[in-house]
Amino acid sequence: MSGKVHGGKGKSGAKDGGPLGSQSHSARAGLQFPVGRIKRYLKKNAAGKTRVGSKAAIYLTAVLEYLTAEVLELAGNAAKDLKVKRITPRHLQLAIRGDDELDSLIRATIASGGVLPHINKALLLKVEKKTHK
């Protein structure tokens, strides 16, 4: 026998060609947004000696990532409808104000967003139907 065989990762990292060293909280949770940064902000803004659990930071990060993806998808659709390839603040405005739930959630004014196209029904010309006698 040539000696002892040890298991585990050891100093060189994971076996079988896997990722080396440690993994970030975001990678473990399968998220793109930074869990560590969100946790740091939560801890910094917590009142007094309030403790912040790691699952709270992961959950908040997942919610922020979902809302961002939702807004970007709707803004991308608005840009595609206007046949442009770049999302502008106008597209964000159209996307947010066009969705009732996002409109109630995001009440902020978007710079360079413009206004929604709307004409009051009282201002439209009334077209009378001609009846055949």
Curated annotation (Swiss-Prot):
GO cellular component terms given for this protein: euchromatin; nucleosome; nucleus
Alphabetized Pfam families for the sequence: Histone, Histone_H2A_C
Nucleus found in the keyword field: yes
PROSITE patterns given in the database record: HISTONE_H2A
Molecular function as annotated in GO: chromatin DNA binding; identical protein binding; protein heterodimerization activity; RNA polymerase II cis-regulatory region sequence-specific DNA binding; structural constituent of chromatin
InterPro entries with a match to the protein in the record: Histone-fold, Histone_H2A, Histone_H2A/H2B/H3, Histone_H2A_C, Histone_H2A_CS
Residue numbers carrying N6-acetyllysine: K4, K9, K11, K15
PTM (free text): Acetylated by ESA1 and/or GCN5 to form H2A.ZK3Ac, H2A.ZK8Ac, H2A.ZK10Ac and H2A.ZK14Ac once deposited into chromatin. Acetylation is required for function at telomeres. H2A.ZK14Ac is acetylated at the promoters of active genes.
Keywords: Acetylation, Activator, Chromatin regulator, Chromosome, DNA-binding, Nucleosome core, Nucleus, Transcription, Transcription regulation
Keyword Acetylation set for record: yes
BP term (GO), one: silent mating-type cassette heterochromatin formation
Region of interest: Disordered: 1-31
Role this protein plays: Variant histone H2A which can replace H2A in some nucleosomes. Nucleosomes wrap and compact DNA into chromatin, limiting DNA accessibility to the cellular machineries which require DNA as a template. Histones thereby play a central role in transcription regulation, DNA repair, DNA replication and chromosomal stability. DNA accessibility is regulated via a complex set of post-translational modifications of histones, also called histone code, and nucleosome remodeling.
Subunit note: The nucleosome is a histone octamer containing two molecules each of H2A, H2B, H3 and H4 assembled in one H3-H4 heterotetramer and two H2A-H2B heterodimers. The octamer wraps approximately 147 bp of DNA. H2A or its variant H2A.Z forms a heterodimer with H2B. H2A.Z associates with the VPS72/SWC2 subunit of the SWR1 chromatin remodeling complex. Also interacts with RBP1/DNA-directed RNA polymerase II largest subunit.
Protein name: Histone H2A.Z
